[in-house]
Regions:
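Alpha/beta enzyme core
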Residues: 1-213, 220-231, 266-270
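Extended, intrinsically disordered, low-complexity segments
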Residues: 217-270
Length: 270
């Protein structure tokens, strides 16, 4: 299954409109787009919960939510899971980085001890009502690939439903990941990141259940805005860039304006 990342509710609508089966609420994307900051643990649980609720209000897709390190220790993780589940999360991802965490493709990451990570996953599993729990490890870049594989196995034993080994650097490492445990694995493909970009077909043959493009939509939006706004700045007009810009009607369709037009007519007075 291909899963695009969403940094806001409009992106979630587009993902659903294009026929994808799930959406990923990207912590990096929310931080970049909402705060204009790098992925260095600036988003709060309250802010993340508000974004999840907004996405849930406008899409019926399953939402996989990046909860970073869980906003604290194992006790805090339980609270985080309950809050995000109430907001509409279908699957909640908890990772093993030290707080403040960094983007999985940044240098200088650190991970907590395995036992602390296992405690967080157990707390998440105990706290959830219906949401799946995804365990993500960044250990491959911090300790060793073998340690990352071991953490995947240990979190599966602790009750995790989906496993996510972040940052493999070679095709050979990628191929080894689904062999690590009898569980669904997700692979994150970041354009410009540390992991080689393979096709969905190649990854399915290796045994991956999900392929995540966490910030492809965000990076595409940045590129599009730079091209169009750069053209306007240079020429003083949008002429020549029409193919780069969604039509006014398409914009209104995506935000479901016809539905609200019908409501206005239904509840009109007089």
């Amino acid at each position: 299954m291909l899963v695009p990342g969403c940094a806001n509710a409009l992106t979630a609508r587009i993902v659903e409109d294009l026929g994808f089966e799930a959406a990923y609420v990207t912590g990096a994307g929310v931080t970049n787009m909402y705060l204009g900051l790098p992925d260095l643990s600036f988003v709060s649980l309250t802010q993340l919960t508000e974004h999840v609720a907004a996405m849930r209000d406008c899409t019926e897709l399953p939402l996989i939510v990046d909860a970073d390190t869980g906003f604290g220790n194992a006790v805090n993780v339980g609270y985080t899971v309950r809050q995000l589940e109430r907001a509409g999360a279908s699957c909640i991802q908890i990772e093993d980085q030290v707080f403040p965490k960094k983007c999985g493709h940044f240098d200088g990451k650190e991970v907590v001890e395995t036992e602390e990570f296992i405690a967080k996953i157990k707390a998440a599993v105990d706290a959830r009502d219906h949401a799946l729990i995804m365990a993500r490890t960044d250990a491959a870049a911090c300790t060793s690939f073998e340690d990352a594989v071991d953490r995947c196995r240990r979190t599966l034993e602790a009750g995790a439903d989906v496993l996510f080994l972040e940052g493999p650097r070679t095709r050979e490492e990628i191929a080894k990941i689904p062999e690590a445990a009898n569980a669904p694995f997700l692979l994150n493909l970041v354009y410009g990141g540390n992991t080689p970009i393979l096709t969905q077909q190649e990854l399915a043959q290796m045994g991956f259940a999900m392929v995540l493009y966490a910030n492809a939509a965000l990076q595409a939006a940045i590129s599009g805005m730079q091209r169009v706004l750069g053209h306007i700045k240079t020429t003083g007009s949008i002429d020549g860039m029409q193919s780069e810009v969604a039509s006014f009607d398409e914009r209104q369709r995506l935000v479901n304006k016809p539905f609200y037009d019908a409501l206005e007519q239904k509840y009109a007075i007089g």
